[in-house]
Amino acid sequence: MEVRRNDIVFVKCNAMVPNGSVQCFDRPAIVLQNNKGNANSPTLIVAYLTSQIKRTDLPTHVVLQHYPGLCKKSMVLLEQVDTISKDDVVEVINHLDTEDVVKVNNGLLISLGFGEVA
């Protein structure tokens, strides 16, 4: 299965035990890794989505537009960046539109301590 940056994918979670706010259930995620890495690596860098829309004031929480394939309104948790095996991707659900790509990129820069771009 080909996976590209900014794809919305459904991921099966292989985490052993829930721990606080760590995401560990099967859920959608956004592929953050560049396409060269996506093509050549057995792993992917992703940020998880949640349907629990909370703390929208945080710059690392990006509420998405409606996307076919997502059952509920969703928010990207850019403080929940994870490296997963490509084998954990069940399917590609959709792809972010340009407006949401900009929001996710800004939230990721803030999450990693690089600031925000205009």
Residue ranges of predicted features:
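Conserved functional hotspots at enzyme active or ligand-binding sites that engage polyanionic ligands
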Residues: 1-118
